[in-house]
């Protein structure tokens, strides 16, 4: 069936140059690699002008020490014990943001209004990778990524067979984690 489209993608961990200015903050003396991401996608042409798509991706945050290592261990009512060796930043197995691996679901629609104009909309959901326990929220003030739902819309305008202009808008819904 030529209306059905399947795809798969993958990106291995990208080893980045260390952040020298943050060597005392990020685990492994400033190392902040980009995690591996894998995914599958399905598209289906519902009509000659309307296509729907579903993507599922999996990001391996736990394999990057500065992102996946455990955050500070503190109990209720305790003050952050920065002086304890177990809570040291910048060390080989130093503190991380404590992020868990994340599965993200994306759903989208594309409508071909004409040979020149395509309209798009989509929804993205990924449970926050930040655990709500044991000091992770406090430590993640440095990297706030708690939005779970995103809505997108966009359009492409083809001015000629070799040139097109694309525009998009994204709205990230508020998400409060405690």
Predicted regions and their residues:
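Outer-membrane beta-barrel porins/channels
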Residues: 1-178
């Amino acid at each position: 069936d030529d209306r059905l489209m399947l795809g798969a993608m993958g990106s291995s961990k990208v080893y980045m140059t260390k952040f020298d200015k943050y060597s005392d903050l990020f685990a492994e003396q400033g190392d902040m690699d980009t995690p591996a991401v894998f995914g599958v996608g399905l598209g289906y042409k519902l009509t000659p002008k309307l296509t729907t798509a579903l993507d599922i991706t999996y990001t391996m945050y736990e394999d990057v020490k500065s992102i996946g290592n455990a955050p500070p261990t503190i109990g209720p009512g305790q003050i952050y014990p920065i002086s304890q060796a177990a809570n040291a930043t910048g060390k080989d197995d130093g503190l991380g943001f404590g992020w868990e691996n994340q599965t993200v679901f994306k759903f989208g629609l594309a409508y071909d209004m004409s040979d020149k104009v395509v309209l798009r909309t989509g929804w993205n959901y990924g449970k926050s990778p930040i655990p709500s326990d044991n000091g992770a929220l406090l430590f993640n003030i440095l990297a706030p990524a708690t939005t779970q739902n995103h809505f997108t819309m966009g359009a492409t305008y083809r001015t000629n067979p070799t040139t097109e202009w694309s525009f998009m808008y994204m709205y990230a819904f508020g998400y409060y984690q405690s």
